[in-house]
Each structure stands twice: as C-alpha cells, then as structure tokens.
C-alpha cells in the first residue's frame, strides 16, 4: 500500500534546504535516477524549519531511503529530522 512519509526538519532555513536539495540531486545522479518506489516529492516551510513530504509505493522503500540516504545527508549539514510521520494513501492521481 502506498504511504505518505513526512519528515520535519527544524530548525532549518531555505538556504539549508537548498544545500540538502543539491546533495540529494547529486546522490540521485550517482544512483542513476530517483529511488525505486518514490511516487511524488514536495517540501514546504513550517515554523522554524521545513517538511519533506513524499508518497512512496511501499512504506519499507521510503523508510529505507530516509534511513540510508536522507538522514545521513541531513547529518552532514548539521540538520536533524524528527521521527517520520506515516499515513496510508488511499488515492493517488497524476495529471
């Protein structure tokens, strides 16, 4: 079942997110493309940080990516992500 994974990073600025985004892009380029199972990705500001919101085909794929790739990149930048919030996705549509 598809899931929405949300990771809140706080504190975190837009400049820090931009650095993270560049590192994630480099990682994806080295891996030959986006991670398997990623269906959509969005980031929005919240409070003194930002939230990474992604829809994954399966929770295990998203948790593995966050643990193996995203959290280490956050740590490289001195950022901390809170516990993932996981929600089931009942419907997903692409235009």
Predicted regions and their residues:
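Short S/T/G/P-rich N-terminal loop/turn motif that feeds into the first structured element of a domain
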Residues: 1-71, 79-95
